Amino acid sequence: WGTPDILGYNRSGNFFTIELKVTKTNKVRLSPHQIAFHVKHPNNTFILVKALSLNSIKLYEGKVIKELDACGLKLEPHSLGLESCFQMLESL
């Protein structure tokens, strides 16, 4: 309820959060609490989605959570693939 799945720091000491999601469809199921958290905390917050149907991992910034809720995986991710996600988080 209200706390993302991962609370982390990168090597530069920058704090970030990640909400983890898995979906079989294009829809990403987000609770009202998860949406509210990312609306209130739009910076250095992320949603990492494992799309089973596409066998891919997509990373979205918290500031686009309303669009992610409305559009699902049709929304362009900030990073695509695990290595790209790691690189982006390390660059914060």
What spans do the regions from the language model cover?
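Short, exposed beta-strand "edge-strand" segments with a Pro/Gly-rich flavor and a Y/T-containing core
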Residues: 24-29, 53-60, 77-79
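Nucleic-acid nuclease catalytic cores
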Residues: 39-67
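Mg2+/Mn2+-dependent nuclease catalytic core
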Residues: 23-42
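Charged phosphate-binding loop/patch that engages nucleotide di/tri-phosphates or the phosphate backbone
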Residues: 72-92
